[in-house]
Swiss-Prot record:
Its cofactor is Zn(2+). This is ATP-dependent zinc metalloprotease FtsH 2. It is found in: Cell membrane. In the central section; belongs to the AAA ATPase family. The gene is ftsH2.
């Protein structure tokens, strides 16, 4: 039984006993008859009548018995002189007793008072520590064998697993590395976008190696008061040394490992730097053969302090990116275990339709499809549920088919999405259209889904311009067919501006800054280029978008009849796949 459970049971037993005592005290009759209380004058009358048999005097109280056996008590007044003579004359058997208080009774109030004061002081300290985050939190390791995750549960990352297998082999067989004089890396940094499986990989290493696994977040080190984070780092590594060989995993290490020395940081600056300094010291403090492996994960390796990444600390840095088509298929097969799939469902086709999806996205995709299958009363997951789940992930919400839309607004959405689809289909280098719909979903009135035929790492200038043209196609179609623009292009313009700005300022595809890449900065108020250069970049971004918009408008005006046919078909059917779009535009 846990300590919290034991404490709760004890509390309830004490409450029941206290309730029974109150019940007996107030409602139940006494087990013995209480003596009758007599006044002093009544006692003297009984004494004169010789009805008193015996008397015991204790301090100022007389307890006695009548001749008939009735007990009584009398409180003696201060002027009760001569009482002994009267009792003797009446022939009453009398005794005198002196009440002696034990020493512990005299000391008990003082002890109780001190105990109450100490308890209140301890309670106040605990409350204060909890309020300011100062309570010590001992990190408990995951014992060997408790991690259910192994490399068999990690799919689509064969290269990354190959790098980590050396760490596992060292933890299992350190002697062969020591014999040859090899030094295993002290630290392993996993970096990549969210949802790619960095934490899963760390747990798989612990599960494969069968060693204790300490896991915590980088933000748990940074506290309000200076010194608390450094203290927690010392405590963590002290426990790690006691449990060696083991793995210490720090998730989101950028919360504590950011670059030092920026004056723009306000609040928590000294505490974070002291915590980072202590982490650096601890990683230098254990030897190459102590068996403590530090693993960390981050989405932003570019903001980490250089001292943290030097050889001897995190000297093995492993990128964990989104999987390719083959990796996505492997991940889908792992997450499909335990799910009832339709025999006709092709996971390879699903993998080809989901470029850029991470492992977390694919797991969520299959889970959403399973929920949709249950909602529709089906016993298997079909491609229909997969399509709907992909749309939910891409567009950010379920279809709002019951929403009432004005006919003119529905036509405008159809024109807008048809413009995207036409430009994407007729522009060389653009990603092919997979689906176009005017069914509202999330905050969008409709959307056009385009995906590359193959996974792509590099993009040329013409390919990026083709993407910009596709984004501007909806706005141009509205202006050509309907005569004016609407707010429906808000997200398209935001994305187009971002791509154009990156082309000019990061990829060397402009003239304003030439081949110089403008660095990013996370510090508020810190300028990374002059105002003149920033203005020149903005002017070139505007000129690029204006030129591409003119080309897109010219393309739409040339193919106006095709656009109208696509709008009519889309308005009637509401959803078209890529083959339908290409058939209509080729007619």
């Amino acid at each position: 039984m846990s300590s919290d459970r034991t404490r709760e049971v004890t509390k309830r037993i004490l409450m029941v006993l206290f309730g029974l005592w109150l019940l007996q005290f107030f409602f139940l009759p006494p087990l013995t008859t209480r003596p009758t209380e007599l006044s002093y004058s009544a006692f003297l009358d009984a004494l004169e009548d010789r009805r008193v048999q015996e008397a015991v005097v204790r301090d100022r109280v007389l307890q006695g018995k009548m001749v008939g056996g009735e007990s009584f008590t009398v409180t003696l007044p201060p002027d009760a002189a001569g009482l002994a003579e009267r009792l003797e004359e009446a022939g009453v058997e009398q005794r005198y007793e002196v009440t002696r208080t034990p020493w512990w009774v005299t000391l008990l109030p003082t002890v109780l008072w001190l105990a109450v004061m100490v308890g209140l002081f301890a309670w106040a300290q605990k409350r204060q520590a909890g309020a300011f985050g100062l309570a010590r939190s001992t990190v408990k390791p995951l014992a060997p064998g408790e991690s259910p995750v192994t490399f068999a549960d990690v799919a689509g990352m064969d290269e990354v697993k190959g790098e980590l297998e050396e760490i596992v082999d060292y933890l299992k067989n350190p002697d062969k590395y020591r014999a040859i004089g090899a030094r295993i890396p002290k630290g392993v940094l996993l970096y990549g976008p969210p949802g790619t499986g960095k934490t899963l990989l760390a747990r798989a290493v612990a599960g494969e190696a069968g060693v204790p696994f300490f896991a915590l977040s980088g933000s748990s080190f940074v506290e309000l008061f200076v010194g608390m984070g450094a203290s927690r780092v010392r405590e963590l590594f002290a426990q790690a040394r006691k449990n060696a060989p083991c793995i210490v995993f720090i998730d989101e290490i950028d919360a504590v490992g950011r670059q030092r020395g920026s004056a723009a940081v306000v609040g928590g600056h000294d505490e974070r730097e002291q915590t980072l300094n202590q982490l650096l010291t601890e990683m230098d403090g254990f030897g190459a053969y102590e068996g403590v492996i530090v693993m960390a994960a981050t989405n932003r390796p570019d903001v980490l302090d250089k001292a943290l990444l030097r050889p001897g600390r995190f000297d093995r840095q492993i990128p964990v990116g989104p999987p390719d088509a083959a990796g996505r298929e492997e991940i889908l097969r792992v997450h499909a275990k335990g799910k009832q799939l339709d025999p006709s469902l092709d996971l390879a086709a699903v993998a080809r339709r989901t470029p850029g999806f991470t492992g977390a996205d694919l797991a969520n995709l299959l889970n959403e499809a399973a929920i949709l299958a249950v909602r529709r009363g089906r016993s298997h997951i079909t491609m229909s549920e997969i399509d709907e789940a992909i749309d939910r992930v891409v567009a950010g919400g379920p279809a709002r088919k019951g929403r009432m839309i004005r006919p003119e607004e529905k036509r405008r959405v159809a024109v807008h999405e048809a413009g995207h689809a036409l430009v994407a289909t007729l522009t060389p280098g653009a990603d092919p259209v997979q689906k176009v719909t005017i069914i509202p979903r999330g905050r969008a009135g409709g959307f056009t889904l385009t995906t590359p035929e193959e996974d792509q790492m590099l993009y040329t200038r013409s390919e990026l311009e083709a993407r910009l043209k596709m984004l501007l196609g909806g706005l141009a179609a509205e202006e050509v067919l309907l005569g004016e623009r609407s707010t429906g292009a808000q997200d398209d313009l935001r994305r187009a501006t971002q791509v154009a700005r990156e082309m000019i300022s990061r990829y060397g595809m402009g003239q304003s800054v030439g081949l110089m890449a403008v660095p990013d900065t996370d510090w508020p108020g810190v300028q990374n280029l002059s105002q003149e250069s920033a203005a020149a970049i903005e002017r070139e971004v505007q000129a690029l978008l204006d030129r591409l918009y003119r080309e897109v408008r010219s393309l739409i005006e040339t193919n106006r009849d095709r656009l109208v046919a696509l709008v009519v078909e889309l308005s009637d059917r509401e959803t078209l796949d890529g083959d339908d779009v290409r058939r209509i535009l080729s007619a």
